[in-house]
Design a protein with these regions (language model features):
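Bacterial N-terminal signal peptides
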Residues: 9-18
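Bacterial N-terminal signal peptides that target proteins for export
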Residues: 1-10
Length: 270
């Protein structure tokens, strides 16, 4: 075991050196993703140059330093609109000011080109389309360089899992504070919800939905059982047909798409 760990550590060090020198209802667990064996080819020289520039410019994020860094980033980068390009069409997203850490984290990862490209790793019809936690070589290297960290939960009574909600995945095991993953996001496809279901959830969660929120869940649908379990930090504003088309892509038994569903994200000027 020690030999294998040593080899893994050595391989990771060599990779970094190369980069530096050459440039129930279902739950959402960020630890569920696994590789489908289709790793993207890495262009070493261009990636190395960008990675080297990134290393020199920014610290590796940790649970200890991410909050201060992201709040500073948010103050310097006020944009809240994003374009999500997929095989089914383009979507427009917006993030919320009152969820500052998650919104800044998303902006930062987009600006660092982490999602250019990435892939959707979990698709469940009438539930969610989840992406970002790719196990491609490029994604793993960038997560190591940018920093492996989590985010404190930012729950708000007005930020719920309606259809089109943008939220972060998280690990369920050993995570009583419900801290979010920092790369793994999802979009709610959802299904129609009855008032009886909402009443049951109110009893279970000790939360009362407003009449407007109940009406919206009944009218539009969503995944209300995830309310106050995952942080909602944005929403889809255009491209619902593309989201629906993605949500019915064939998958294997673990909800991984049978065909690679690549996407790209970019920041739009407000």
């Amino acid at each position: 075991m020690k030999g294998k760990q040593g080899m893994c550590f050595l391989s990771l060090c060599l990779a970094v050196l190369l980069l530096a020198c050459e440039g129930a209802e279902p739950a959402l667990d960020a630890s569920m993703a696994r590789s489908n064996g289709e790793s993207e080819e890495v262009t070493v020289d261009s990636l190395a140059i960008k990675a080297k520039q990134a290393i020199l410019a920014y610290p590796a994020l940790t649970d200890a330093n991410c909050e201060e860094f992201l709040l500073t980033w948010a103050a310097e980068h006020p944009e809240h609109r994003f374009e999500l390009t997929t095989s089914k069409g383009d979507m427009l997203l917006e993030t919320f000011d009152d969820v500052p850490l998650h919104s800044a984290n998303f902006h930062y990862k987009v600006a660092r080109k982490y999602y250019a490209p990435s892939e959707f790793v979990r698709i469940v019809p009438d539930f969610v389309v989840q992406g970002g936690n790719s196990e491609d070589t490029r994604a793993q290297e960038l997560r190591w360089l940018i920093g492996k960290h989590t985010l404190p939960a930012e729950f708000h009574s007005n930020r719920l899992h309606f259809r089109g909600a943008l939220a972060m995945g998280r690990t369920y095991t050993g995570n009583p504070e419900k801290r979010s993953a920092s790369y793994d996001f999802y979009l709610v496809v959802g299904r129609k919800v009855t008032r009886a279901e909402l009443a049951r959830l109110e009893r279970e969660k000790g939360f009362t939905y407003t009449e407007a929120q109940k009406a919206r869940y009944v009218r539009e649908g969503g995944t209300p059982h995830l309310d106050f379990e995952h942080t909602v930090f944005g929403q889809l504003t255009d491209g619902f047909d593309a989201l629906k088309a993605l949500s019915i892509e064939p998958t294997d038994a673990s909800d991984w798409p049978l065909r690679r569903q690549e996407f790209r994200l970019k920041v739009l000027s407000d």
